């Protein structure tokens, strides 16, 4: 729905603002790969971070963790990104849990190393 997409866009910008404030450089948003995608790709120090945004509304606890199928898609996008750009940084897979209580005020819980490539 338009509302969902609009919320998604705001949430994504909100996460990017947070990352930039923490010193990350945003290199891609909505990276689409063959058989995969990544919401945000950001660089900090020796890490290139592939960030998955998860939404929750009305403080409904942590949504289901990022399932294995989704992890595979993110890892696939990471592999392609690394190959295409020749990026030599250490890949890291993070999750950004965005909550909204009224569709306006967003809050963020940011998880470093939410998963790694070994389990899939």
Label each PLM-derived region with a short phrase.
Residues 56-78:
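Mg2+/Mn2+-dependent nuclease catalytic core
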Residues 31-33, 55, 97:
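Short, glycine/acidic-enriched loop or turn micro-motifs at the edges of active sites
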Residues 84-120:
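Domain-level recognition of nuclease-like catalytic cores that cleave nucleotide substrates
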